[in-house]
Amino acid sequence: MLQSQLQSIVEKFAVSATVSTIRPLGSGLINDTYLVVTEEKDQPDYVLQRINHEVFPDVDMVMRNIAIVTRHIRERLIAQGETDLRHHVLEFLPTVEDANRLYAEVDGHYWRLMVFIDHAVTKQEVNPESAHAAGQSFGHFQAMLADVPCQLGEKIGRASCRERVFRAV
């Protein structure tokens, strides 16, 4: 995708910084993900992501679930005395037109923009140590959600889920 196209999508969100560059981030198989680097040192960088609506047909429900989960985790962290929330929980930016955290293009693509979490890493290869650390992190995540006070919607339907994912990627 062209830099100018990505820049125009970023401009649909309430970003207060000047964008310097936008480049691919990671090598995900499902969503298209880009790092949005800002010029100002006191402003965060961002992650721009095009959600694969072939895999996640109800994109609005995905974002509702994320809002519920991130709000709950944020409240739990505050109650525990955590002050550095930016490095512990996702923060999505609203669009400039409304408070929606999704931008829908005319051609049916959905985009979201979140604050980049500094020092976050992704592993392309798994070794026992990173698998153990991932398991611990996932267990901590599950513990944080143990008392979430609502029912989350199902993001990917159970029927032919695997087949749909493989077709979409």
Language-model segment annotations:
Residues M1-P24, V69, I73:
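Juxta-kinase regulatory segment immediately upstream of eukaryotic protein kinase catalytic domains
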Residues S20-R164:
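Conserved ATP-binding subdomain of kinase catalytic cores across diverse folds
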Residues V165-V169:
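Hydrophobic alpha-helical segments, chiefly the membrane-spanning helices
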